[in-house]
Amino acid sequence: MDATLNIAIAAEFELSEKIVERLEQSALEISKVSIVEIIPFEEEQNIRFRNKGVEQLSPNEVEWADFNYVFFAGKLEQVSHIAQAAEQGCIVIDMLGVCSALSDVPVVVPTVNESQLLELRQRNIVSLPDPQVSQLALTLAPILQETNLNQVFVTSLLPASYTDAETVTKLAGQTARLLNGIPLDEEETRLAFDVYPYQTPNLSNQLQRIFPQLDRATFHAIQVPVFYGLAQKVTALSDYDFDYQPQNSELIALEETLITPVLNGEQENGEESVKLHLSQISAVENGVEFWSVADEQRFNLALLSVKLLEGIYQQGY
């Protein structure tokens, strides 16, 4: 492989670390990684790639033309950076699906619909969907290869890290305060020891970009007091009975016992390999139910984004 790949990462510190860890494990030969601080790092926060310090650039000083690929995990109001990078010749991996509503931007989940990368050159942008959608797509893909589905219901239990690193810190702080009998401020949104509904727009549309034949998917999401790990309870229904026998794969691990986000975090802590864990599979009338868990930072975002980059590179983009 060509050893001249220059890669920029535009994400918060914690996610940037996980992307770099995954790049170090990739077969891609990368000459340089840089951080673009669209979300400013703390003074003591530094990234290392292959034991070397990584330069940290402000969005105002970056020359996007210096990079071949950009990992972007910013908010909708920051999409001007995506446009600038793409216009200057970079291939931009939109990690959070903020561009997924654009008809000429492909929405791709690795191993599921990589043929859509043919559309990449229209804008030099490809969207990885929201972690809720990518996790669901990976579990539905084997079913849709065998049968048609007329309805999918999914309830996602969202950890603090799904929002951002600041929310993780808030949850930790609130938990400690409440355990020590210190009440929260009246105006403070309570995260610890509580749950509440979470609204994420356009998830059904993102899923249909991946599976055009699936036009009835209902998403429910609940913010839960867990630090890391996205869990989903899924019911997939057809017009007739079907036999769902999932297999272990590169990305999916079948589990005989129930895996929760906390158990998954404990088991994968310190391990290079991360997977989407599937358990509690049971038949229902004309359908199937199952439970899936993944570390949405290390798996849904970092690993899938790097897998997407590898697919893009292998197709010559």
Curated annotation (Swiss-Prot):
InterPro entries found in the cross-reference section: NAD(P)-bd_dom_sf (IPR036291)
SUPFAM superfamilies: Glyceraldehyde-3-phosphate dehydrogenase-like, C-terminal domain (SSF55347), NAD(P)-binding Rossmann-fold domains (SSF51735)
Domain of life of the source: Bacteria
Cysteines paired by S-S bonds: none
Cited Gene3D superfamilies: Dihydrodipicolinate Reductase, domain 2, NAD(P)-binding Rossmann-like Domain
Record family assignment: Belongs to the aspartate-semialdehyde dehydrogenase family.
PANTHER family (alphabetical): ASPARTATE-SEMIALDEHYDE DEHYDROGENASE (PTHR46278:SF2), DEHYDROGENASE, PUTATIVE-RELATED (PTHR46278)
Protein name: USG-1 protein homolog
Annotated organism of origin: Haemophilus influenzae (strain ATCC 51907 / DSM 11121 / KW20 / Rd)
Gene: usg
